[in-house]
Design a protein with these regions (language model features):
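SAM-dependent Rossmann-like transferase core, predominantly class I methyltransferases
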Residues: 2, 16-90, 95-110, 121-124, ...
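A short N-terminal interaction module
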Residues: 1-14
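Polar/charged alpha-helical tracts
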Residues: 8-9, 63, 196
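S-adenosylmethionine
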Residues: 92-94, 98-196
Length: 196
């Protein structure tokens, strides 16, 4: 049968996407959407595209905290894909996320609404004094376990935290159980070329 005629706007959009692909632009930026952990996330060049390898990190945390109510902090949240995925799959969790970029945080907040989860987002430079005071509010913890996973030259950090008291992790008030970060990375050769 005869298909529907494309509007001028649709034709222009298709032409724009084809041209972007010809210039090796990521399809996710061209479409404005990336799939991650069974969910859709809006993406722009203000945030990195969620990578499939990052799903391994999310899966590990979900497995470790299934059925619990952990307090989780995601540092450098970007699109919010880690924080939002954790909040979606750990419904009892209290998830906070920080990023230095207001544009990234706006995108992350939109993604949280789109995926119908509650995450507390904060604009924060982790190298600033503000980060120290933010963490002092959650100071009654020590590192119980640190895990590093290396996949395709990417290093993920996942820190499990435990209170100094003998209370169970799930009942902690104002303390973190887990800090997760998947910061952007630049390979050493590329970093040298950027600096020079």
């Amino acid at each position: 049968g005869k298909g529907k005629e494309l509007s001028d706007t649709e034709k222009f959009k298709i032409k724009e996407i084809v041209e972007g692909l010809r210039l090796y632009k990521p399809i996710q930026y061209l479409l404005g959407i990336a799939d991650f952990y069974g969910m859709e996330f809006k993406v722009t060049p203000d945030v990195l595209i969620p990578r499939p390898e990052t799903a391994e990190l999310v899966e590990r945390i979900i497995t470790d905290y299934q059925g619990q109510a952990p307090r989780i902090l995601d540092i450098g949240t970007g699109s919010g894909c880690i924080a939002i995925s954790l909040a979606k799959h750990l419904p009892k969790a209290e998830v906070a996320a920080v990023d230095i970029s207001p544009e990234a945080l706006a995108m992350a907040e939109e993604n949280a609404r789109m995926n119908q989860v509650s995450v507390s987002f904060h604009e924060l430079d982790i190298l600033s004094e503000g980060y120290s005071s933010f963490m002092q509010e959650k100071q009654n913890f020590h590192v119980r376990e640190t895990r590093f996973s290396c996949t395709r030259n990417k290093i993920f950090t996942y820190v499990k935290l435990k209170s100094h008291t003998e209370e169970t992790e799930a009942s902690l008030i104002g303390n973190l159980n887990c800090i997760v970060s998947n910061p952007p990375y630049i390979m050493y050769r590329r970093e040298k070329s950027i600096i020079s």
